[in-house]
Amino acid sequence: MSALKIKKGDRVVVLSGKDKGKTGEVTKSFPKDAKVIVSGVNVATRHRKPSQANPQGGLERVEAPLHVSKVAIATADGKPTRVRFEVKDGKKVRVAVKTGETING
């Protein structure tokens, strides 16, 4: 299995689906499933039963995971770019294909 090219804290653009074109920050990643959760994107409504923790119950809006193929890292100007790995100074770093700049993290 190859390394996940998108990590927590990355700014990404949604490439397809109902939220196409929206940008957000990755809040959580699931490398084994190749999925990420992006803030404010792919929001689903869950019906919650009343419980001791939540005595009121009701509707709850939750961000659902997206497959990594549906998102791309956003450049400084907000456009999507692919990512490749390079070895610089003995360290494996992520590099934006369009701009050639190193992605932090």
Swiss-Prot record:
SUPFAM superfamilies: Translation proteins SH3-like domain. One of its GO terms (cellular component) is ribonucleoprotein complex. Gene3D superfamilies: 2.30.30.30. Keywords: Ribonucleoprotein, Ribosomal protein, RNA-binding, rRNA-binding. GO terms for molecular function: rRNA binding; structural constituent of ribosome. It comes from the Bacteria. Belongs to the universal ribosomal protein uL24 family. One of two assembly initiator proteins, it binds directly to the 5'-end of the 23S rRNA, where it nucleates assembly of the 50S subunit. One of the proteins that surrounds the polypeptide exit tunnel on the outside of the subunit. This is Large ribosomal subunit protein uL24. It comes from Rhizorhabdus wittichii (strain DSM 6014 / CCUG 31198 / JCM 15750 / NBRC 105917 / EY 4224 / RW1) (Sphingomonas wittichii). The gene is rplX.
